[in-house]
């Protein structure tokens, strides 16, 4: 996300086009995908892969908030690793959460509390940090222009 934070000799050799490609696909919502296409918005709502802030909602995500993230779900674990930006408010933050929702402690039994516990917790955690960041004093407004990769 921030190649300038790594010494030049240790960076991945990505072109500007490569970087924009990664930013675009890391922040893409299911409805924005062409290949593969996800036309069923009920089965694949915007929140399908955006657990922090939105995991408990089937509502569309507005264009001014973007999560550049990677999620995972397996064996009673949920993970979301996200760089969150709000283009209108000039807010940015990094947040990673790993949550175990396996009340019976039996793995591979498909008895996990993703919907009841995990997704609501992830969404509330993300919203709590987002609200904090909206109020936090900053010395300067971040330049988020390089992350505007969607029309």
PLM segments and residue spans:
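Structured C-terminal helix/loop/strand segments within mature extracytoplasmic catalytic/sensor domains
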Residues: 1-151
């Amino acid at each position: 996300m921030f190649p300038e934070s790594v010494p030049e000799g240790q960076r991945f050799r990505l072109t500007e086009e490569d970087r924009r490609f990664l930013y675009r696909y890391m922040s893409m919502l299911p409805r924005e995908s062409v290949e593969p296409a996800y036309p069923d918005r009920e089965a694949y709502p915007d929140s399908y892969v955006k657990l922090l802030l939105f995991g408990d909602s089937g509502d569309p995500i507005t264009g001014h908030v973007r999560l550049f993230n990677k999620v995972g779900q397996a064996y009673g674990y949920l993970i979301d690793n996200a760089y969150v930006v709000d283009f209108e408010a000039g807010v940015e933050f990094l947040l990673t959460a790993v949550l175990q929702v396996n009340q019976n402690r039996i793995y591979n039994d498909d008895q996990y509390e993703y919907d009841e516990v995990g997704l609501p917790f992830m969404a509330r955690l993300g919203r709590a940090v987002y609200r904090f960041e909206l109020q936090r004093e900053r010395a300067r407004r971040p330049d988020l222009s390089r992350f505007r990769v969607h029309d």
